[in-house]
Amino acid sequence: MLKIRKHLPKDIPYRVLWLNDHKVNKFTGEEVWEETTLRKQKQWFAEYQKSDEKRFFTICDGTKPVGFMGLSKISKINKNADLFVAIGDADYRGKGVGRLVMTWIIDYGFNKLKLHKIYLNVYEDNIPAVNLYKSLGFVVEGKIKDDVFFGGKFHNTLYMAKFYKRSKK
């Protein structure tokens, strides 16, 4: 059974493993950086714990971590945040886990944090992700052409957003 919990120090080795996995990092933007290490990720975690602008979660099947997600750049003034999701364990990709956890984090952002807008960026050629985000109500707000170079070619980045729809009473 899948569950979502706050990111813990014991999750850092999984983060290192997944961020160094080409099949995960090619869609997170991490590929353009150098390989990460346990030390770097422990430093990242220490900084993360001091921040009010981030909420980071681990996706688990029982007690086994299978991915991570969160909201960053949370602006209390502008009531918006940047969403990210990575399914690190290959056995859980393409099985609806992304949709399930995206639904949870969107609800968390709009109802717990009272955000007005949740945004994300995605490579235009990541068709499964683009289609998932559109099906969840995200709309394309813009496109940056030839934004990132990896895999021997340039990739466009789409900026997408979903707005909270408050019911009128």
Q: What is each of the regions a protein language model found here?
A:
Residues 1-42, 168-169:
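A short, well-structured alpha-helix characteristic of acyl/acetyltransferase catalytic modules
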Residues 36-92, 163-166:
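Acetyl-CoA-dependent GNAT
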Residues 64-67, 128, 154:
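Glycine-rich acetyl-CoA-binding "A-motif" of GNAT/NAT acetyltransferases
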Residues 98, 102, 125-129, 146-151:
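Short glycine/proline-centered loop/turn elements that form peptide/ligand docking sites
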Residues 111-121:
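Conserved GNAT acetyl-CoA-binding A-motif
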Residues 119-122, 139-156:
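Conserved catalytic-core motifs of GNAT/GCN5-like acyltransferases
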Residues 133, 138, 160:
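Conserved active-site tyrosine of GNAT-family acetyltransferases
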